[in-house]
A protein has these predicted regions:
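Bacterial N-terminal signal peptides
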Residues: 8-16
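N-terminal intrinsically disordered, low-complexity segments enriched in P/E/S/T
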Residues: 22-162
Length: 162
């Protein structure tokens, strides 16, 4: 019984000392950060869903032809108020990749939160998934460099000036 009390006490102590950020962050929050000003804008799932909707129907290396629905990156950036030359996209699993702004302009990539009408879950590419129109631009985009930019489980994007 004494061992149980010590384990309980230690558990409570470690829980109390855990980082506060873990308690503030909610799966589905998306933070856009500006590297230059260090300002940030966080979209909740609810505020993200109020932005203009965009769709891309395409295959990916991991999915058959699928209708992805979300918000164009142009609209996400406009709503955040940040501009730059590169987007550093970060995922929940700490994967990150840099996406040149010319991709946003040339291919109208989207930040999807639905797949075939169903909200993306973390175990299924969610909460957000960067999607390029691969089928519409097959000759240009069906290359490993672009596959590496199809980031799922996106939780933050840093707008960079370089």
């Amino acid at each position: 019984m004494k061992g149980f009390n010590i384990v309980t006490l230690l558990s409570i102590t470690f829980f109390a000392l855990s980082p506060a950020r873990a308690m503030d962050y909610r799966i589905g929050d998306l933070t856009i950060q500006d590297e230059k000003s260090h300002a940030s804008h966080t979209f909740s799932k609810e505020s993200f869903s109020t932005l203009p909707r965009a769709m891309i129907t395409t295959t990916t290396p991991w999915t058959p032809s699928t209708k992805f629905e979300g918000v164009s990156m142009k609209d996400v950036l406009a709503a955040s108020g940040f501009t730059g030359k590169t987007l550093r996209v970060h995922a929940l699993n700490d994967y990150w990749v840099d996406i040149p702004m010319k991709d946003v302009d040339s291919y109208n990539i989207i930040l999807a939160n639905k797949r075939d009408g169903v909200e993306l879950k973390v175990r299924d590419f969610g909460p957000y998934f960067i999607v390029y129109p691969l089928d519409d631009n097959a000759e240009d985009l069906n290359k490993p460099i672009y596959y590496s930019r199809l980031v799922w489980q996106v939780d933050s994007i840093t707008v960079m000036q370089k």
